[in-house]
């Protein structure tokens, strides 16, 4: 009768016999090991209960660099995660998140960790000086392109080499076209002849000021004048030697420069060309913080597409 009443209330009861003592002990507080039952399960039910899978802990090695993963990170669980940017030989990475979520901190951390690889190079285009502290802490160079004395480039430094002279021709033609001057085949031929004359001069004489002085076309001189020391952007491009120098860790603050579209394209083209000469097979990390700002710029957007 007791069993009937209990079952009627929705409880499942069983009359114990040989297991009566264990069942009674298991009902008392503190007896955790008494009345341990091992019910018989069907195989399909058991398969659903068994832990046959686990959290993916990331790749064990970076096969492209034949080295360990970039870094070991903590997770919400008990399994750490091996973070690596490469999928095969492709290391393109995009980090998206709300303002203040820590994207710049993560980028700086990735840049610091990347130096674990032998002969690694890190070049970072910054906005708001978010990476300045860690770059200087790593012994790197930080160039604020809005600072009058931060950086000086000499785009014509190596024009004695045919490949460099060809690049310089395209660069000058781009500056002239950006000034709404039509670059005709005859003008390109004249630009090339001027470059050949300049290439025969000593390296320290290969400046934009001398190039403008050698140019015969008035439209060419007018278009290039803003980039000489007679104009507002000569401090960046009209030098008799490059102050950039080689460094395995370098960052460039772009905030002020990106507010000056006329200068941004010219400076970025020359700066990218210098960096591309360093992409010689060494492990290289190129970081663009606040990339949306750079994608808005026509030249920078085209350069990113070329890299990708």
Where do the PLM segments sit?
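Glycine-rich, often proline-containing surface loops adjacent to acidic residues and nearby aromatics
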Residues: 1, 89, 247-251
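Short, charged/polar micro-motifs that form catalytic or ligand-binding hotspots
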Residues: 1, 100-101, 294
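Long, basic/Gly/Ser/Thr-rich N-terminal segments
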Residues: 1-39
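Hydrophobic, Leu/Ile/Phe/Ala-enriched alpha-helical segments that form helix-helix packing faces
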Residues: 2-10, 114, 195, 275
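Residue-level "edge-of-site" marker
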Residues: 19, 128, 148
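P-loop NTPase motor domains
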Residues: 25, 29-81, 132, 136-141, ...
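Glycine-rich phosphate-binding loop of nucleotide-binding enzymes
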Residues: 65-145
